[in-house]
């Protein structure tokens, strides 16, 4: 809660609309509080650390309450935030829930709602006898950790390069634009697979691959906004005062091009989630045995040819779809609010 309030107060100093400042402040807090340790610190240490991240639960609830107060007039935004906060809350609370071991074989191909060997399988079990409910809830944590982290890294790199190219111009702009145009010449999935084949399959390499495929798009957006903003009076006033170019880019340019970037960030989270899930489905992403939605879809696809086992595919597919829908609806809601403000 203190971190959320601190982020909120910092963002208000940039004269953001109150609703946008509160929302972004909560999102920044959520990026760091509840999710980072599980995969980034390694499976055993990360899972142990996730049990002490109890402050993440009130952080998610605080974000949702702030959104309720600020976005009451936007039904689309509230639906999107509800979906996102639901999965964030699941990701934070899953260590405390009385779930079965997601990797333990119990009874194969048990139908949803069936009790077998004294165990209730709410959403059934897969071909290896593992509980689908447990794997779905634990899997959302991996997807959110890597999706948020990859998008954050891509935005840091892309926005930094875009500000440098747009503000400084000259050979800086030519060099950055050339590299980005080369990367953009590859189809996204082809570039991701190529990088992972060269570097190997690991979580860190996924971050590199997603950054290389996403940062050029962000760079072009930020560069265009910076080219327009650097001609404004407030930038020229900062130049007259003798401010350092880095200070001008971070304090004058970046806050004043925030609107399109916030909307794009929400959409980019959805794109990154699709990319990571697809890579896992193709066997190029996060590796088993830990649960992941893309891996669950891959394992459930053959069994789903028979309708009685289609739940193995439907459950993770609906989970991915609902999370992506939440990001997209939130982006639409922020766009509506920005237009009103």
Task: Put a short name on every predicted segment.
Residues 171, 225-234, 334, 340-341:
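Transmembrane helix boundary and interhelical loop/hinge segments in multi-pass membrane proteins
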